[in-house]
């Protein structure tokens, strides 16, 4: 196996019932492995019955209704257990896993494990988070920092945004493109890059908190923990 994390790269994404990581439920999930050219070589897909109503707003984003999840989805506990198992197996193989805005997906997965009386994923590392990388490498670029915009900036096709598989694969390809554009900063050993992202995310959150306190709410707080909050 290559020493470059971006030559064989895991990718992961969730679609869920909402934005609160403590209370939202997994609706669909995708894990894949990309080769050095961004081609998909392995994949796992899940559709879950979250056990609760999927809000209309969430369904509008990812296209999965409560009715479909109940009819076609598997029990949440089974899905969560399998996701944790596959992620753990990728880390055991020495692969890094790309997750765009990792604290959302990994924190939600952590709370889903607890909710279903499962052991949470152990230390998830190494993680590659293109959102953190993009903010660190191109700090002053104007515009949104969504996956859709990042894909456009780094020349990656994203034709079905908010589908777990499309988002996961695009995030991985963005990470690969960034590593090739900025090798001095990003083409380093995966665990070293993981540690750098811990520091970068803390700095980014502190800057955002300072901005919000100056311009909107003097009591605003945000967590800089990464990759799990």
Question: Model features per residue range: what roles?
Answer:
Residues 42-62:
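Short, surface-exposed acidic-centric catalytic microdomains
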Residues 30, 47-50, 131:
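Residues at the C-termini of beta-strands that transition into short coil/loop
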